[in-house]
């Protein structure tokens, strides 16, 4: 016990961790807060599950048009608990989208987007867009018939935009047609760009909530 106390005192002297702990645990929670105010936190938990299971799958997934489908099949049938890891990833993805939608409704119906919380709302909207992008890019990674045609349709949508439409299509596909470059880009977006972007906006979102507090009742 003496050793653990001395270690604690060493960190306390340098980092003042007790002050941080007191600030986190003593934050005032308004009496009107109920279970529906937990929807944002549940969305965060789903994201963390996504991150963990997605990271585990990168050890087996091969982002090539010739090996993507077979690597997913190998994960599902030959890797110990691989089927469970991928299934949890898919289930938590669906749960994340559902919790996000319910969270948006809760914030809107309780006026959580009003002054002075406009920027908190904006960061939330950006995270909602990123979450949808997660779904689109992840859907294509098995590179089966459903994934391939989903990519072809989604990546072709920007073609309707005047002037820059064709450029955006080629940017998404990595060329004029859907192929290896497309899968590589979607894999990069899904496993690196989108997770880090979402993490940054989540941090901003939580810091704003921490600073401004929870909005009052209607």
Curated annotation (Swiss-Prot):
Membrane-spanning residues where? Answer: 35-55, 93-113, 119-139, 189-209
Q: What is its main location?
A: membrane
Chain positions recorded as heme c binding sites: 38
Q: Where does heme b 2 bind?
A: 89, 190
Q: Where in the cell is it found?
A: Cellular thylakoid membrane
What is this entry's stated membrane topology?
Answer: Multi-pass membrane protein
GO cellular component annotations of the record: plasma membrane-derived thylakoid membrane
The protein's superkingdom reads Bacteria
Q: Which family does it belong to?
A: Belongs to the cytochrome b family. PetB subfamily.
Its protein name is Cytochrome b6
The record lists the organism as Prochlorococcus marinus (strain MIT 9301)
């Amino acid at each position: 016990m003496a050793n653990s106390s001395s270690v604690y005192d060493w960190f306390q002297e340098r980092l003042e961790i007790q002050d941080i702990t007191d600030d986190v645990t003593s934050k005032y929670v308004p009496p009107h807060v109920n279970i529906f105010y937990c929807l944002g936190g549940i969305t965060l938990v789903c994201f963390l599950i996504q991150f963990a299971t997605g990271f585990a799958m990168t050890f087996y997934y091969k982002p090539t048009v010739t090996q993507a489908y077979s690597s997913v099949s190998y994960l599902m049938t030959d890797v110990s608990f691989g089927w469970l890891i991928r299934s949890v990833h898919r289930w938590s993805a669906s749960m994340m989208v559902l919790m996000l939608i319910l969270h948006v409704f809760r914030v809107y119906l309780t006026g959580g987007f009003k002054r002075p919380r406009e920027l908190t709302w904006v960061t939330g909207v950006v995270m909602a867009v990123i979450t949808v992008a997660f779904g689109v890019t992840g859907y294509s990674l098995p590179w089966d018939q459903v994934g391939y045609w989903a990519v072809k349709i989604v990546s072709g949508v920007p073609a309707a935009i005047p002037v820059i439409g064709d450029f955006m299509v080629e940017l998404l596909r990595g060329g004029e047609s859907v192929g290896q470059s497309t899968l590589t880009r979607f894999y990069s977006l899904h496993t690196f760009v989108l997770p880090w972007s979402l993490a940054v906006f989540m941090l901003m979102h939580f810091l704003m909530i921490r600073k401004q507090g929870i909005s009052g009742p209607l």
